[in-house]
């Protein structure tokens, strides 16, 4: 068995190679690799991916996403675990351990983990290199009936109820849509407009909202990169996407980049991610004054596009949405888990939902 590692240049060469094109399974999709290559926080020497091969057969891989955090007044390079997969046929051959310890040897003191399978939490913590798992509490508001997805599709023994459940969802959502026609029109005090120009004024804005310490650093280039190099492409699964274990295509995927203006002055920013009718507030930079108008904007977008849920980890926004009780069906508390190296003094409370690779998935 052979483990290959790839930095930025090597990753570019790999995805253009005949070897990559001939693999039955690939360790990274082409467009996801391009995103890694263009990451503004990625240095030429950063190892981004480790892949294990048995002859010409891919049997496992692990990858990271470089980032920058500010802790104790110092910018520090960090690496978010972004993918980890081992072929079922090789899970008894220590492939996972070989891959993960290749990663640990290089980035032990700078590794961050989020969006992990709960069953792996104890395994990570047994290494003794991480702070106790931290959690951020968020809120999810279901805005359409989706019993089929929430219950039937997840519980195999209830699959016989799927046709009836789909019919019920469609009928109830039709009723809910008709009711929405009679909603009272809102009046916004601020101007919120879609804009993906990340210039010097934008940089000044987000700098004013980022804390002086204990946060994941972002600048204009990061947001341009996120929108320019998505990990998920909109469309049906194809031959290429079936070669990759993780998601690379989705029936609906896109971003909505919104700037907030008060008296023609840029005063806030919000980045929304929409995937398969689910809206997530990935980044939010604004004062309390704008929260009411932002909630109106989000709820109007949900109504116009018939989206099924809203997820936010900004308590101010969640509290404002909660006031509009007739605009959603069920509220639910959700949590996001973070495992952070002991070597960097940072807490999860400074993270935004989109930090790490969440904004891409």
Each language-model region and where it sits:
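An N-terminal, globular interaction/scaffold subdomain
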Residues: 28-30, 42, 48, 62-65, ...
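Basic, Lys/Arg-rich alpha-helical nucleic-acid-recognition elements, primarily the DNA-binding modules
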Residues: 63, 80-84, 103
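Active-site/acyl-donor-binding loops of N-acyltransferases
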Residues: 66, 110-166, 228-230, 239-249, ...
């Amino acid at each position: 068995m052979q483990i290959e590692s790839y930095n930025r240049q090597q990753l570019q060469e790999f995805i253009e190679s005949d070897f990559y094109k001939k693999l039955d399974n690939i360790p990274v999709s082409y467009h996801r690799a391009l995103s890694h290559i263009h990451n503004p926080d990625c240095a030429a020497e950063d190892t981004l991916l480790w892949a294990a091969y048995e002859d010409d057969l891919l049997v496992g891989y692990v990858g990271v996403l470089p980032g920058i955090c500010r802790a104790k007044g110092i910018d520090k390079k960090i690496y978010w675990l972004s993918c980890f997969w081992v072929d079922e046929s090789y899970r008894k051959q220590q492939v996972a351990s070989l891959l993960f310890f290749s990663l640990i040897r290089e980035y032990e003191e700078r590794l961050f983990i989020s969006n992990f399978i709960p069953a792996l939490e104890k395994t990570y913590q047994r290494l003794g290199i991480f702070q106790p798992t931290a959690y951020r509490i968020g809120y999810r508001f279901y805005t359409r009936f989706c019993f089929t997805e929430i219950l039937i599709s997840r519980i195999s023994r209830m699959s016989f109820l799927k046709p009836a459940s789909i019919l019920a969802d469609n009928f109830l959502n039709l009723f809910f849509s008709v009711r929405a026609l009679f909603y009272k029109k809102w009046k916004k005090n601020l101007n919120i407009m879609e804009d993906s120009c990340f210039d010097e004024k934008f940089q000044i804005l987000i700098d004013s909202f980022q804390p002086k310490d204990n946060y994941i650093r972002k600048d204009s280039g990061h947001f341009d990169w996120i929108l320019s190099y998505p990990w998920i492409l909109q469309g049906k699964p194809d031959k290429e996407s079936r070669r990759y274990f993780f998601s690379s295509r989705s029936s609906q995927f896109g971003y909505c980049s919104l700037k907030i203006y008060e008296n023609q002055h840029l005063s806030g920013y919000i980045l929304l991610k929409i995937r398969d009718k689910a809206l997530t507030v990935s980044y939010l930079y604004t004062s309390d004054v704008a929260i009411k108008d932002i909630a109106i904007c989000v709820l109007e977008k949900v109504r116009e596009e018939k989206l099924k849920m809203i997820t936010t980890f900004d308590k101010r926004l969640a509290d404002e949405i909660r006031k509009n009780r007739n605009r959603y069906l069920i509220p639910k508390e959700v949590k996001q888990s973070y495992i952070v190296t002991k070597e960097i003094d940072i807490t999860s409370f400074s993270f935004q939902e989109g930090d790490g690779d969440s904004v891409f998935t």
